[in-house]
């Protein structure tokens, strides 16, 4: 259909309405009036980021269960009109005379989407790219999303060597003939370690009810435990990821009743990158693959 000469953009999310008006004014000659061709933007109070775009000759409506999902729908619709968000300071804005788009819907393939580079920290640009990293500098009016607590390496936070090593060296990795304090991990077959970590994670969750993902992840170096108990399991499964997944699974089981919607995050990284032969993560466990050894110049 021909691009309407007069458009009315309305909705219950002011930021989405503002963005739609901004870009339509940049790519068309349309004017805005409350009596114009209706474009209705509606967001719910949930966290689902799927959205629906319904288009006919009488109106356009974009709907989502969440504000962030609605905003993604707005940017998706604009991209189908030819707009391109290339960088935080570079956009392609075509002149548009027609709307040749059929109704459609979209749902993210990944619940959490992040790019580890400086450009993705720009909140407005990251949302246009449909990223939902909690590291990006987004503002409240851009809508809420999945919240990631403590994001990365957490073993030292869960069991601090400075606090525990002198009195309980058995809590930490055994390698090179002794328990190690520096550049070490934790002994994940030690039941006391599991108990301490489980209680710490439960406290994180109780203290941060607006977060859904909590990291139980190895420190940023090698040093996996090679004590008899750990080594026996890891050798049988062919990787030091075996004791890690068993450990994380146990915490995931412990938090599930009180926090059925929360997830435990961990890494497949360095000595844990290779998957175990038979051990499978629980449904409420997220594994983040970190192939740091790979050459990123080749596909």
Place the predicted regions along the sequence by residue.
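Substrate-binding cleft/loops of secretory-pathway carbohydrate-active enzymes
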Residues: 265-296
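Short acidic low-complexity segments
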Residues: 28-44
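A generic structural signal for alpha->beta connector loops
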Residues: 50, 261-263, 284
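Residues at or immediately flanking beta-strands
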Residues: 36-38, 213, 263-265
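Feature activates predominantly on carbohydrate-active enzymes
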Residues: 2-7, 11-23, 48, 55-213, ...
């Amino acid at each position: 259909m021909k691009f309407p000469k007069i458009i009315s953009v309305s909705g219950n999310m002011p930021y989405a309405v503002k963005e739609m008006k901004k870009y339509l004014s940049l790519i068309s000659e349309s004017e805005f009036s409350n009596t114009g061709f209706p474009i209705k933007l509606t967001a719910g109070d949930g966290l689902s980021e799927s959205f629906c775009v319904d288009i006919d000759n009488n109106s356009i409506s974009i709907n989502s269960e969440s504000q962030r999902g609605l905003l993604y729908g707005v940017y998706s619709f604009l991209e189908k009109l030819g707009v391109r968000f290339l960088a935080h300071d570079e956009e392609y804005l075509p002149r548009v005379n027609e709307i040749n788009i059929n109704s459609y819907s979209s749902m993210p393939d990944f619940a959490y989407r992040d790019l580890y580079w400086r450009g993705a920290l720009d909140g407005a640009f990251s949302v246009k790219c449909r990223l939902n990293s909690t590291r990006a500098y987004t503002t409240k009016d851009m809508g809420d999303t999945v919240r990631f607590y403590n994001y990365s390496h957490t073993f030292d936070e869960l069991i601090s060597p400075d606090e525990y090593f002198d009195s309980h060296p058995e809590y930490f990795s055994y390698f090179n003939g002794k328990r190690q304090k520096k550049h070490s991990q934790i002994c994940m077959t030690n039941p006391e370690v599991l108990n301490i970590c489980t209680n710490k994670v439960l406290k994180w969750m109780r203290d941060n009810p607006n977060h859904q993902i909590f990291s139980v992840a190895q420190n940023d170096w090698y040093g996996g435990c090679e004590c008899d108990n750990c080594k026996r399991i890891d050798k049988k499964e062919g990787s030091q990821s075996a004791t890690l997944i068993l450990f994380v699974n146990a915490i995931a089981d412990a938090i599930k009743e009180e926090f059925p919607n929360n997830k435990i995050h961990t890494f497949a990284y360095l000595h844990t990158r290779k998957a175990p032969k038979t051990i499978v993560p629980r449904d409420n466990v997220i594994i983040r693959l970190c192939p740091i050894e790979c050459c990123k110049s080749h596909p």
